[in-house]
């Protein structure tokens, strides 16, 4: 038996399965014949007993109970071998199924590789044709036939003349020049009669902000407390009322040490109501104070943001001539008034 079990290696599983089925069939038939011979007293076939190879010393034509027991044990052994062969067959089927699936995947991959190879071959031929055409165009010097020639010509010979022509032919209106000159005039020249210590007129300003302008700007002004609190810069909330002044001690000590008076529950309720009534008034007063502080702090900012007043700058170079003309006009007016009075 062990030899037969160990033999199941290196040979097809179908041969072992067919052999085990035939052995099981032969032993079971012989066992049933022994049962019939015991029941009827008929003789057995000695050739079948020899084929079974039972460990019997004397093989007789008549069935005995000992022979029946040996046949049953032999049938059990053959059945075990047959069951082991079936298990191996099941494993073989699983492995064969996996092999078939892998073969299908390999076939699909082979098809994909073949299609990719064909596409690669087509692309290669297409690129070869394009390169050959471009080489011909480059050798012939026809820049209009291929894109490569156009790029090379643009890189080798930049069109500087055309760009210069565009710059020269570009028109600029006088209004644009005047407006631009007006914008930069306040920072490029000083006013007539400028003095270094005197403040500048509203139309003129220095090219860079001065110290006074920087000090009066928003960067040098301290923001109000509620703004500091909003950005997390204030350590104490100034808008909340302080309750320390309103809280009274529950014990009042008189002149003597022993005289200690404790307030009743009604008095405590009255004090709490008074404190609750005073809280909104204190909050309103503090909010008004904070608003006044913010307004006072924002006044320099508003003064900066307000547009400067227009100043009439007298740029007359000959004030004496103008004054004499004005005097003549006044004399004429006086003469006319006198004539009217005499009339």
Curated annotation (Swiss-Prot):
<keyword id="KW-0175">Coiled coil</keyword>
<comment type="function">
    <text>Component of the Mediator complex, a coactivator involved in the regulated transcription of nearly all RNA polymerase II-dependent genes. Mediator functions as a bridge to convey information from gene-specific regulatory proteins to the basal RNA polymerase II transcription machinery. Mediator is recruited to promoters by direct interactions with regulatory proteins and serves as a scaffold for the assembly of a functional preinitiation complex with RNA polymerase II and the general transcription factors.</text>
</comment>
<feature type="coiled-coil region">
    <location>
        <begin position="86"/>
        <end position="125"/>
    </location>
</feature>
<feature type="region of interest" description="Disordered">
    <location>
        <begin position="247"/>
        <end position="343"/>
    </location>
</feature>
<dbReference type="GO" id="GO:0006357">
    <property type="term" value="P:regulation of transcription by RNA polymerase II"/>
</dbReference>
<dbReference type="Pfam" id="PF10018">
    <property type="entry name" value="Med4"/>
</dbReference>
<dbReference type="GO" id="GO:0016592">
    <property type="term" value="C:mediator complex"/>
</dbReference>
<keyword id="KW-0804">Transcription</keyword>
<keyword id="KW-0010">Activator</keyword>
<dbReference type="GO" id="GO:0070847">
    <property type="term" value="C:core mediator complex"/>
</dbReference>
<comment type="similarity">
    <text>Belongs to the Mediator complex subunit 4 family.</text>
</comment>
<keyword id="KW-0539">Nucleus</keyword>
<dbReference type="InterPro" id="IPR019258">
    <property type="entry name" value="Mediator_Med4"/>
</dbReference>
<dbReference type="GO" id="GO:0003712">
    <property type="term" value="F:transcription coregulator activity"/>
</dbReference>
<comment type="subunit">
    <text>Component of the Mediator complex.</text>
</comment>
<feature type="compositionally biased region" description="Acidic residues">
    <location>
        <begin position="317"/>
        <end position="343"/>
    </location>
</feature>
<protein>
    <recommendedName>
        <fullName>Putative mediator of RNA polymerase II transcription subunit 4</fullName>
    </recommendedName>
</protein>
<keyword id="KW-0805">Transcription regulation</keyword>
<feature type="compositionally biased region" description="Low complexity">
    <location>
        <begin position="271"/>
        <end position="316"/>
    </location>
</feature>
């Amino acid at each position: 038996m062990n030899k037969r079990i160990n033999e199941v290696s290196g040979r097809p599983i179908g041969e072992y399965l067919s052999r085990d089925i035939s052995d099981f069939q032969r032993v079971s038939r012989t066992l049933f014949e022994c049962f019939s011979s015991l029941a009827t007293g008929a003789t057995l076939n000695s050739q079948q007993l020899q084929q079974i190879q039972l460990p019997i010393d004397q093989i007789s034509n008549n069935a005995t109970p000992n022979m029946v027991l040996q046949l049953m044990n032999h049938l059990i052994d053959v059945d075990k071998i047959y069951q082991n062969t079936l298990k191996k067959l099941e494993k073989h089927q699983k492995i064969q199924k996996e092999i078939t699936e892998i073969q299908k995947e390999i076939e699909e991959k082979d098809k994909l590789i073949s299609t990719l190879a064909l596409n690669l071959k087509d692309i290669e031929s297409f690129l070869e044709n394009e390169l050959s055409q471009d080489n011909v165009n480059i050798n012939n010097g026809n820049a209009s036939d291929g894109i490569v020639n156009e790029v090379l010509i643009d890189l080798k010979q930049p069109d500087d003349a055309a760009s210069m022509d565009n710059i020269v032919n570009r028109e600029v209106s006088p209004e644009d020049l005047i407006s631009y000159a007006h914008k930069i005039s306040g920072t490029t020249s000083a006013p007539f009669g400028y003095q270094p210590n005197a403040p500048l007129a509203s139309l003129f300003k220095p090219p860079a902000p001065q110290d006074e302008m920087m000090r009066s700007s928003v960067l040098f002004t301290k923001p109000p407390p509620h703004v500091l609190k909003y950005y997390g810069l204030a350590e104490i909330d100034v808008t909340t009322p302080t309750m320390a002044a309103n809280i009274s001690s529950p014990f009042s000590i008189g002149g003597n040490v022993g005289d200690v008076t404790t307030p009743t529950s009604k008095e405590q309720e009255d004090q709490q109501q008074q404190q609750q009534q005073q809280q909104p008034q204190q909050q309103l007063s503090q909010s008004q104070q904070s608003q006044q502080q913010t307004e006072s702090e924002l006044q320099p900012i508003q003064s900066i943001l307000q547009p400067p007043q227009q100043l009439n700058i007298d740029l007359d170079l000959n004030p004496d001539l103008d004054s004499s003309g004005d005097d003549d006009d006044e004399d004429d007016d006086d003469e006319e008034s006198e004539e009217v009075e005499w009339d």
